[in-house]
């Protein structure tokens, strides 16, 4: 039986990063809403509990989310983060106040007290000998009086109690966020908590996960048939392979050609799954259906909802032809859930995803989401472990709504045709351009394989169609044609990202090819926005 960490979600948009950091340490973890019952907490069997951050204030009194009392009575270690620290302090007899100075962003925290959690962990030492941590803060309220039994563990000039510890009861708390990559020692802090404080072993790995997931799918589905929407993207492909391993021919994949796919996507999907993997795949031409419903629609949320709705309708029609079809499988992963406010709807919605939004209550199929608790890098690891080809597993993410969210404003077939050709040129040149590491830089990969080219070196790259025309010159005449934006980002977890510094020569070649080969486009621009403040997709 694996050791496991229970994470209670108070609504932070980065809660699942806590789970990722715990899993990076080889320890299994799960996220549940904060309002689970005391009985659930007692019966869960956690080796430790982590309380996430959140958008609320404990000063709101009875309206504020509270930690289940059983958490503090279990006798297992507890780590509170941001709101989790404030809730811990308030419920155990401390005091919380509105801060006069809100802290959002980088901060330098001084470690105090030589606690077991922070011992010998620091980024630098001051001339006075104080250990300092470079961290990420995001809070308004702060603890101004610690509960009985707690001692100071960390501080900043604006937040005198930035960390506290009751080592007798193994309770620790930080006002900063160790789960985000901006906190340089965050991974070490969480590893220290789960290994040294909670006593967990590194016994969670992908082969074990496959065995457990396969058994769970079999128990969940029984003898029913499952229908899965196969897009050719990483998530749906890995979900299909995992479910097929579990139930074989009980799985039918439905590949919907809605006119918003990448160039030659349909051919690739059919060859890979139907011909090579032996999966039952039904291809449906629904271009007219989707384009008809999207006509005249410009609002991004409305487009996503329409695309999600039409997917579901297609699946329902197909399910009606299969008497034993009871389940609709989707490749939903953690970032989808996070950005749609996820479990319990405790967070603030950023935008809805077709996988987790737009499903009508009249849906006659139950949802099967075997990847729902996995991050993108874990999905890729799973795909490799399942024997899928490397180039498929490490293909860039493609949104469920397809090019529908890469065409700004109204979606038209002509726009999609232009965009898919421009996008194919961009991806081809990224693959054809060798990646050269900048002098003095260190390479970081998510699969341990050195980057072969700029496609490997970027986490996601694509073209975006802008429904505006610009003046240009072609030969001896003036043109008035459309604009395409190129987007390429690098990220570890898709929660935050920075724009990729592609070589000018590469960008120039891509621009020249698109303008010369895709009639109807006369201008190419490059997006240099990070996430945040922008999202990776434009819509």
Curated annotation (Swiss-Prot):
Keywords: ATP-binding, Glutamine amidotransferase, GMP biosynthesis, Ligase, Nucleotide-binding, Purine biosynthesis. Pathway: Purine metabolism; GMP biosynthesis; GMP from XMP (L-Gln route): step 1/1. PROSITE patterns: GATASE_TYPE_1 (PS51273), GMPS_ATP_PPASE (PS51553). It holds the Pfam family NAD_synthase. The active site is at 82 (nucleophile), 177, 179. GO terms for cellular component: cytosol. Residues 4-203 form the Glutamine amidotransferase type-1 domain. It catalyses: XMP + L-glutamine + ATP + H2O = GMP + L-glutamate + AMP + diphosphate + 2 H(+). GO terms for molecular function: ATP binding; GMP synthase activity. Residues 204-395 form the GMPS ATP-PPase domain. Its EC number is 6.3.5.2. ATP binds at residues 231-237. Catalyzes the synthesis of GMP from XMP. Homodimer. HAMAP family: GMP_synthase (MF_00344). This is GMP synthase [glutamine-hydrolyzing]. It comes from Herminiimonas arsenicoxydans. The lineage of its organism: Bacteria, Pseudomonadati, Pseudomonadota, Betaproteobacteria, Burkholderiales.
